[in-house]
Amino acid sequence: MENIETILRLAEEKILLVQNLKELQEYKVEFLGKNGIVTGELKKLGSLNEQERKEFGLKINKLKDKIQNIIKAKEEILEEQELNLKLAADKIDLTIPARRYKQGSIHPITQCSEELIQVFSQFGFTIENGPNIENDFHNFTSLNFEDDHPARQMHDTFYLKGQENNKPLLLRTHTSTVQIRAMKNGKPPFRFIAPGRTYRSDSDMTHTPMFHQIEGLVIDKNINMGHLKYVITEFIKSFFENSNIELRFRPSFFPFTEPSAEVDIRMNKNDKWLEVLGCGMVHPNVLKNVGIDSSEYQGFAFGLGVERFAMLKYNIKDLRQFFEGDMRWLKHYNFGSFDIPNLAGGLTK
């Protein structure tokens, strides 16, 4: 009995002084392990009679339970201490400067597109979209292109392997295709713009194989050239934020408009004239191809290159720079996310 009390007291003293879990595990093995002190006491049972074995065995089990409880209590204390130390080590000092966050920016094409759309929205234009891959009817035939028109040639148009109505599919060369689809599927009046990518086999300082267009269409009763001139004039002045900008409409030719015109602008009286867009009254054949009676409805259409307008407004010299991915150039010609116009804000950067 005295030996059991001595073992218990020894265990309490040693475990009380333990400083870490590793040391505690060593004492657990020392007292309760296969060759431990308590296990050694159990070996004495063989030399005792039945009654003594029963009494001694009960005492040994109680000793074992007490030592296990002492170890468990100490283990909980040590685990809490280690957790607190770890939390203290992982503590974040909020006064330390954070890593610099590289914030993205708005590409000038995206910025210019949003500004153009914003201006047209003020004139009541909505937005229509269509597929980039088109068939011959929507891209050429419905728009009054003759079968031998140069625009149909391989050197101007990207043709694909697939076919529709025995004619190859192609990458649309303008977003006028959207106008055809919208007129076929709806009823006049129409007033919308069709922004999107277009594709032509051309590449130099002022042309790229892929570029962005915005084409507009107005179809209604009693529409005339005066309406077209007013919309284009007010649009140009609003986009460039210059009420004194000069415009001139030069006679031109497009298969899908008659009469047709190209619009030139100059910021100041001594500047050279710069061509910025094409426009005209929708050709009666185009209206006929989409099932609209040209004796009842008339309209005008216009088309502009987003990159062209971005170059003029942001003073960018080479069209190819938009697509080169030069980080130095992008850092110079970039816009913050809050610079994108919305219905509540203006256009000034």
Curated annotation (Swiss-Prot):
MF (Gene Ontology): ATP binding; magnesium ion binding; phenylalanine-tRNA ligase activity; tRNA binding
GO biological process, alphabetically ordered: phenylalanyl-tRNA aminoacylation
Domain of life the protein comes from: Bacteria
EC code(s) of this entry: 6.1.1.20
Binding site for Mg(2+): 258
Chief localisation class: cytoplasm
Gene3D superfamilies, A to Z: Bira Bifunctional Protein, Domain 2
Reaction equation(s) it catalyzes: tRNA(Phe) + L-phenylalanine + ATP = L-phenylalanyl-tRNA(Phe) + AMP + diphosphate + H(+)
Cellular localization per UniProt: Cytoplasm
GO cellular component labels: cytoplasm
UniProt xrefs under InterPro entries: aa-tRNA-synth_II, aa-tRNA-synth_II/BPL/LPL, Phe-tRNA-synth_IIc_asu, Phe-tRNA_ligase_II_N, Phe_tRNA_ligase_alpha1_bac, Phenylalanyl-tRNA_Synthase, tRNA-bd_arm
Binding note for cofactor: Binds 2 magnesium ions per tetramer.
Family under the similarity heading: Belongs to the class-II aminoacyl-tRNA synthetase family. Phe-tRNA synthetase alpha subunit type 1 subfamily.
Record text on subunit structure and interactions: Tetramer of two alpha and two beta subunits.
Name this polypeptide is given: Phenylalanine--tRNA ligase alpha subunit
Taxonomic lineage: Bacteria, Pseudomonadati, Pseudomonadota, Alphaproteobacteria, Rickettsiales
